[in-house]
C-alpha cells in the first residue's frame, strides 16, 4: 500500500525527543513489514527540511534531506502550477472554515488524484478532509 507521508511524521521519525517518535517508529515498522511505500510533495519535503534546519542545524538538515531523497520507498511529487491551483480551488475553498495550509491542500489533492486513502500523519486535518490515518 502507498501512504502519503506528512511533515509531522517525518519530523517524529527523525527526532527521538518528539512526542510522537515511538508511535511513528512503530507505524513505520508495520508499514515497511507490509511492503508499504510512501508518496508526498516537494512542499512537505521543504517543510521538513526547514524544521530540521532550525532544530538541528544546516549539516544535519542536509543529511536528513539527502537520506529521504535517496530512499527508494519514497516518491516526491513536484508542486506544479496546476497542482497548486487545483489544491486551492478544491480544498481551500471547500474547507474555508478550516485552517488548512497550502501544503495541506496540495497533500489532499495529491492523495485524491493518486487514489491514496491513508496518510502517515499526526494531525487531524487529513481526517477532516476525508482521509484515514495509518495506525
Short names for language-model regions:
Residues 10, 45, 126-127:
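A generic structural signal for short hydrophobic patches within well-formed alpha-helices
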Residues 2-6, 40-41, 100-101, 123, ...:
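Histidine- and aromatic-rich ligand-binding microenvironments
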Residues 1-40, 53-66:
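Short, well-structured N-terminal submotif of metal-dependent ribonuclease cores
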Residues 75-117:
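Active-site neighborhoods of divalent-metal-dependent phosphate/nucleic-acid chemistry enzymes
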Residues 34-35, 71-72, 129:
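Structured helix-beta-strand junction loops
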Amino acid at each position: 500500500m502507498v501512504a502519503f507521508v506528512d511533515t509531522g511524521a517525518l519530523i517524529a521519525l527523525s527526532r527521538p525527543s518528539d512526542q510522537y517518535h515511538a508511535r511513528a517508529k512503530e507505524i513505520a515498522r508495520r508499514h515497511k513489514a507490509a511492503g508499504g511505500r510512501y508518496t508526498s510533495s516537494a512542499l512537505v519535503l521543504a517543510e521538513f527540511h526547514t524544521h530540521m534546519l532550525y532544530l538541528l542545524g544546516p549539516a544535519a538538515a542536509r543529511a536528513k534531506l539527502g537520506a529521504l531523497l535517496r530512499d527508494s520507498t519514497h516518491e516526491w511529487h513536484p508542486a506544479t502550477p496546476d497542482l497548486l491551483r487545483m489544491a486551492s480551488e478544491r480544498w481551500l475553498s471547500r474547507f474555508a472554515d478550516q485552517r488548512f495550509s497550502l501544503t495541506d491542500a496540495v497533500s489532499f489533492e495529491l492523495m485524491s488524484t493518486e487514489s491514496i486513502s491513508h496518510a502517515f500523519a499526526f494531525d487531524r486535518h487529513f481526517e477532516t478532509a476525508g482521509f484515514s490515518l495509518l495506525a
